[in-house]
Amino acid sequence: MEPAVVSADMETDGEQLCKAARNGDVAKAKSLIESGADVSFFDRDGLTPLMHAAKLGHTDAVKALLEAGAPWNALSPSNQSAGDFSMDAGHQEAFEVLLNAGIQAELILGTIARKTKKNGDSEGDYLEDRVTFSEDKLMDSDSKAVMMAWEKPLMEAHAKAVCSGGGNILNVGFGMGLVDTAIQQYSPATHTIVEAHPEVYERMLQTGWGKKDNVKIIFGRWQDVLSQLESYDGIFFDTYGEYYEDLREFHQHLPKLLKPGGIYSFFNGLCGGNAFFHVVYCHLVSLELENLGYSTQLIPLPVKDCLGEEVWRGVSQKYWQLDTYYLPVCQSIEGSE
């Protein structure tokens, strides 16, 4: 029996809009939109008109759909956005249009990585939570990983960056102590560590961190201990239970905390479950740091071989699912000239 042929008249406006997007037919797409077609429509494959246009590199159709309010951050059943489709297919022009749309939207709305503290999972919840230490991970009570041993090579690279000029080093967020152990290898003049979780702080003392000659431990949330901080030659920031807004807030204090010519870096786990969203946030944070007077170099580090399925056994949430980690190295624009 032959399958039934669906005529254009029988197709919904949404299906026709997907078809126009696939064909790159901008005039038809605009006509359908003006007639009330839903730009956020998902077809039977779970794809939006914008995804179809992006997948095939129809840049003008991508622009028209975005101008009509098509959601740039909608996800397919395979967890891919329109930007992912254009990126994977090598459609550079469409990709750049979507990237700019994502950056502009996040500058204004911040819908992906920014969350309000009222929605739970805030730093306050974490600081009151019990944590569990094991040889290869630090976990909260929901079996979410606070820090894991696979990050060790990344932390060593971060330490190398922030210690490149020697002097006085600040780390915000001790976790398993991976980055601080690496920092110690460079024998900094002083090594200040800010840690807010009481159990992590206790473990630091138990394992001798309070007895190291060049180490100063400050217990508390970084927001509450700013008056105890000085200025540093290298700074690393990696807190758990905070959001992008907290990182942005910390960046506002860099002009006071980072000495001229100093190096700043942070754990770049922004949107670590989606490649395109991660690119958007790498660009966004670089742009916002530039507005504060800092240049950002993103150094690609392959991590695929570190992340077999066994790494995530017993962990409820894979906070990193990408093949490459982009390590940020930030320096004042004046100091790097």
Tell where the protein language model's regions lie, with residue ranges.
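Conserved ankyrin/ankyrin-like repeat signature
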Residues: K28, D60-A61, E93-A94
